[in-house]
């Protein structure tokens, strides 16, 4: 894995250059003059002062796939796999902290909820390397365990909780339910409490919602059990947004199709 960490550092250095170049380009842009001309930003008229308050984030997806390639097992499948995952994310955080010290700008580490890149990166890698890990059509978000892992709520939160504190640019974990868990609020409260204990800083609950476009019946179904219509609006959460499944990107459609519930309530 030494070669991997060397390549990881070189890639992080490239990201630093790209992020700084983007910030400097923005500072020189005249397209934002309207902010100052219309007194929408009152504290300064200097673009350098304005942009330095922002964050330059190193983001990552596909930690579990990385572990699978390096160790032939997934992130949640052994203590050694989890430890390697933590080591990788700690290295990324170290790079972000170093860049902040070197430049004086707000570099941070972001656990990316990839949308377009989730599928695009996997497709590009599969064309180049033909590795089965990228052949499924998407990469798993940030440090999440694979969506088809079927592990329990508690194991998922325990595994992912190790990473939240390292990602100072933002992070989120999800729990996947087979159906809407509205009849068991106590179970949701237990999940939230356990997430807090494990260091999870932001938690979301996922569950499918199907709505019949003909009669309005709601639930989870392929064909409406009330009117037998197959004209169904399917709402799912992806990358933090509730959207109609028809409008998902290719990679996210692959991800949703692979999802398995972490609990049945």
Where are these regions (language model features)?
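Long, C-terminal-biased catalytic regions of enzyme "large/alpha" subunits
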Residues: 1-265
């Amino acid at each position: 894995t030494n070669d991997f960490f060397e390549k990881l550092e070189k890639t992080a250095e490239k990201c630093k250059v790209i992020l700084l170049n983007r910030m400097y380009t923005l500072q020189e842009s005249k397209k934002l003059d309207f902010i100052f001309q219309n007194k929408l930003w009152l504290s300064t008229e200097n673009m350098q002062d304005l942009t330095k308050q922002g964050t330059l984030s190193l983001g990552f997806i596909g930690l579990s796939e990385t572990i699978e390639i390096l160790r032939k097992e997934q992130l949640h499948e052994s203590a050694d796999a989890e430890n390697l995952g933590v080591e990788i994310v700690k290295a990324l955080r170290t790079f972000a902290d170093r860049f902040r010290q070197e430049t004086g700008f707000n570099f941070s580490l972001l656990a990316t909820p990839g949308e377009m890149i989730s599928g695009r990166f996997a497709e590009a890698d599969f064309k180049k390397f033909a590795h089965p890990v990228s052949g499924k059509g998407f990469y798993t978000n940030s440090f999440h365990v694979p969506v088809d892992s079927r592990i329990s709520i508690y194991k998922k939160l325990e595994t992912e909780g190790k990473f939240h504190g390292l990602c100072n640019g933002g992070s989120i974990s999800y729990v996947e339910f087979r159906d809407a868990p509205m009849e068991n609020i106590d179970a949701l409260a237990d999940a939230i409490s356990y997430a807090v204990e494990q260091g999870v800083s932001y938690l979301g609950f996922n569950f499918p919602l199907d709505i019949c476009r003909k009669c309005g019946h709601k639930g989870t179904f392929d064909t409406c059990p009330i009117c037998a219509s197959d004209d169904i609006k399917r709402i799912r959460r992806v990358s933090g947004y509730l959207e109609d499944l028809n409008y998902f990107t290719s990679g996210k459609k692959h991800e949703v199709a692979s999802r398995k519930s972490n609990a049945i309530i």
